[in-house]
From Swiss-Prot:
Protein name, UniProt field: F1 capsule antigen
Location(s) in or outside the cell: Secreted, Capsule
Spans annotated as Contains potential antigenic determinants that may stimulate T-cells: 100-150
Keywords linked to the UniProt accession: Capsule, Plasmid, Secreted, Signal
GO cellular component: capsule; extracellular region; pilus
Main localization (coarse): secreted
GO BP field: cell adhesion
Species annotation: Yersinia pestis
InterPro entries linked: Adhesion_dom_fimbrial_sf (IPR036937), Adhesion_dom_sf (IPR008966), Caf1 (IPR015335)
Signal peptide: 1-21
């Protein structure tokens, strides 16, 4: 009888131990936020007509037009912006006449921020001045200003340039 009672005791203790070993659970909600990539925009507004001087050139610092860049991330700096064109002249954009005579003039691209510092983006890989300024929130105007004829006299007519912008670190 002693042998049977010890077997029964072991069976009862095993059942008690199993009953007290409950499974514990915890839960949480995992989330992830997805944002759309920056979608930059570039628009151009032509300035007032420019008068050709008697020598066939144009004055410097005349407003040719305004490039407005938008859609970049807050905190983007001026040297993160690179305007390019087919001529590829470092620091300058080249406008070409549409009369078929290939008259050209060059421009620089600058801006002003609220602190009245020059904002100098890269143009064809190089910037005109060394200031690296945080761009305005939302959009930034860049002023396209004349430098002068690119060899030879200019003729009256429409001048154009196909400008592409790349903004780094977006």
């Amino acid at each position: 009888m002693k042998k049977i009672s010890s077997v029964i005791a072991i069976a009862l203790f095993g059942t008690i131990a199993t009953a007290n070993a409950a499974d514990l659970t915890a839960s949480t909600t995992a989330t992830a936020t997805l944002v759309e990539p920056a979608r930059i925009t570039l628009t151009y507004k032509e300035g007032a007509p420019i008068t050709i001087m008697d020598n066939g050139n144009i004055d410097t610092e005349l407003l040719v037009g305004t490039l407005t860049l938008g859609g970049y991330k807050t905190g983007t700096t001026s040297t993160s912006v690179n305007f390019t064109d087919a001529a590829g002249d470092p620091m300058y954009l080249t406008f070409t006449s549409q009369d078929g005579n290939n008259h050209q003039f060059t421009t620089k691209v600058i801006g002003k921020d609220s602190r009245d510092f020059d904002i100098s983006p890269k143009v064809n890989g190089e910037n005109l001045v060394g200031d690296d300024v945080v761009l305005a929130t939302g959009s930034q105007d860049f002023f396209v200003r004349s430098i002068g004829s690119k060899g030879g006299k200019l003729a009256a007519g429409k001048y154009t340039d196909a400008v592409t912008v790349t903004v780094s670190n977006q």
